[in-house]
């Protein structure tokens, strides 16, 4: 049971860090290589 509670306390932390990293990476890619769906005249 101790291992299960440890898993429940660490999985959300790892998921939050991973999603933050992925979102930041996508933002930086779209900054340098803009999405062609957005046209800025």
UniProtKB/Swiss-Prot annotation:
Membrane-crossing residue ranges in chain numbering: 7-27
Topology relative to the membrane: Single-pass membrane protein
A Pfam family: PSI_PsaJ
InterPro entries, A to Z: PSI_PsaJ (IPR002615), PSI_PsaJ_sf (IPR036062)
Biological process according to GO: photosynthesis
Annotated localization: Plastid, Chloroplast thylakoid membrane
Entry-linked Gene3D superfamilies: Single helix bin
SUPFAM superfamilies: Subunit IX of photosystem I reaction centre, PsaJ
A GO-annotated cellular component: photosystem I
Principal subcellular localisation of the protein: plastid
Source organism superkingdom: Eukaryota
Key words, A-Z: Chloroplast, Membrane, Photosynthesis, Photosystem I, Plastid, Thylakoid, Transmembrane, Transmembrane helix
Function according to Swiss-Prot or TrEMBL: May help in the organization of the PsaE and PsaF subunits.
Similarity comment: family membership: Belongs to the PsaJ family.
Annotated PANTHER family: PHOTOSYSTEM I REACTION CENTER SUBUNIT IX, PTHR36082
Protein name: Photosystem I reaction center subunit IX
Organism of provenance: Chlamydomonas reinhardtii
Record lineage: Eukaryota, Viridiplantae, Chlorophyta, core chlorophytes, Chlorophyceae
């Amino acid at each position: 049971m101790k291992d299960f509670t440890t898993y429940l306390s660490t999985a959300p932390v790892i998921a939050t860090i991973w999603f933050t990293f992925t979102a930041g990476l996508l933002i930086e890619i779209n900054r340098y290589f803009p999405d062609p769906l957005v046209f800025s005249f």
